[in-house]
């Protein structure tokens, strides 16, 4: 765990955790992603502000800080399709084989509702300049159980010719 004092600096330890979270997202491992997001949320967010979308969005950006190696800075409330995606990661020009990552956050509605919103509001349409894969990531926080759930789907976007 990155908060333990084992002789390494905390930043290096956390960057390893962040790489593991990014790997879980890339591999489509929703269970592992949710578990790790929950740990970061618990460690970095005050219990006073815990049940709020901004706190969860900031948690995601902290958890995926290692993505800066491969992606532009995350864009909050990215205008796309018929609405605004909560967070979008666009790959750097030097990383053309990396997928775009679209993250939608929900409270007490289930991760499937987040994925449905991405599809129903046609968020991927605004990302059609990317001819590769788009990862749709839905993350939900259940206030009663205090559990995070995640659903990850792959979407292939074919750029207009």
Place the predicted regions along the sequence by residue.
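Short, conserved secondary-structure transition motifs
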Residues: 139-147
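Extended alpha-helical interface modules used as scaffolds for assembling large macromolecular complexes
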Residues: 1-114, 120-122, 133, 147-161
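Low-complexity, intrinsically disordered Gly/Pro/Thr-rich segments
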Residues: 122-126, 132-140
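Generic hydrophobic alpha-helical segments
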Residues: 67, 127-128
